[in-house]
A protein has these predicted regions:
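Local sequence-structure signature of Cys/Sec-based thiol-disulfide redox active-site neighborhoods
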Residues: 1-27
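C-terminal alpha-helical interaction module
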Residues: 2, 7, 43, 75, ...
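Short alpha-helical
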Residues: 12, 36, 63
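Alpha-helical elements of the RecA-like P-loop NTPase motor core of helicases
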Residues: 15, 39, 70
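Conserved beta-strand scaffold positions in the cores of enzyme catalytic domains, especially
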Residues: 28-30, 61
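Thioredoxin-like thiol-disulfide oxidoreductase module
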Residues: 32-49
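Structural micro-motif
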Residues: 45-55, 65-66
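Non-catalytic, surface beta->alpha helical segment in thiol-disulfide oxidoreductase systems
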Residues: 57-82
């Protein structure tokens, strides 16, 4: 499986999310977040992005570390009810 991770310099959460992804057998493509990358990402997903990391899995913008962690765990019991 592949994940694209948009990162910034000296970003602890970026390092953590890359470790989480690697531990779950993802291949990582890392992109440094700069003005052009930010503009491309916001245009592609029609969303305002203010933080890094930002992770894309299966052409879906998952979000930052906590969103990726929740994505790895799958739906919770309460989500299955609804």
């Amino acid at each position: 499986m592949k994940a694209t991770v948009y990162t910034g310099p000296s970003c602890t959460w970026c390092d953590r999310v890359k470790t989480l992804l690697k531990d779950n057998n993802y291949t990582i493509e890392e992109i440094q977040m700069n003005g052009a990358a930010l503009e491309d990402l916001q245009t592609k997903f029609n969303k305002t992005i203010r933080t890094v990391p930002q992770v894309i899995i299966d052409n879906s913008l998952i979000g930052g570390y906590h969103e990726v962690e929740a994505h790895m765990k799958g739906p919770t019991a309460i989500n299955k009810v609804y």
